Amino acid sequence: MKIKQFIYILFLTAGFLVGLPYAYASPLINGEDLAVSIRNAIPPENILIEASMEVTQKNRKRIQTALTIETKLLGQDEFMTTYKTKPESNRMVWQIRRKVGMQNAYSCKPEENSNIHVGIAGSSFTLADFGLEFLHWPSQKTIKKQRRKSRLCNVLESKPMKSIKEKYSRVLSWVDEKSGAIIAADFFDINGEILKRFTVKGLTKKNGQWQVDELEMRDLNEGSKSRLKLNY
């Protein structure tokens, strides 16, 4: 599975920049254009994959949850991603419905777990994170180019309106120029300190294609680590 296909499943955007011209690779591009291109990406096909969420708490206790992740096209400009815990008994379901040019629509079952800022399956990955809510904020600025994991990236800074109460005060994303994938991101709290740190891990090359085996989110405040592992 390519990076682009994998990121579709996890962060709803198929490499985050599907169809973004490579002409963007040279100059420092406009941040709003970059964010819009990410938000408007649509997967080319339906995708179903088995996964597991492994949470390592501060006390070293580990919690593992089996998941099914499905991305389904609803039209040319709309799709839905569903995350389901396994087994079916006491199953929890999270859904993100996305349409080009519109805000995301979220749903959870049971409904008492409908807070999009609460971690999925007890992890540090929230539904808002998977929905890339920070890319809908009004301030989007590309601040520099920087290498991350030996890859040249555009660093995108996203900030919310000051009058809106958000969990994060800003987010820095490292967007790989070649694949168009967000390969790392720092989430800052209201005091300007790094609250969470995301990174793509487990990159392997199979049959000439890059395959992503794992995503990691570290909660620096809680001292926990969440790993989303893909079972191909």
What does each of the following model-derived ranges do?
Residues A128-D129, R151-Y232:
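Gly/Pro-enriched, hydrophobic low-complexity segments
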Residues G15-R62, E70-Q76:
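N-terminal leader/targeting segments and the immediate start of mature chains
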Residues I69-K72, K141-R147, K201-L203:
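Short amphipathic beta-strand and strand-loop transition segments with alternating hydrophobic
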Residues A51-T56, K86, E157-M161, R218:
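Generic short beta-strand segments
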Residues L67-C108:
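Mid-chain, structured segments of secreted extracytoplasmic proteins
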Residues M1-L10:
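Bacterial N-terminal signal peptides that target proteins for export
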Residues S26-L34, N40-N46, K61, S89, ...:
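Flexible, processing/modification-adjacent segments and terminal tails
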Residues I47, A51-M53, L67, T81-Y83, ...:
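One face of beta-strands
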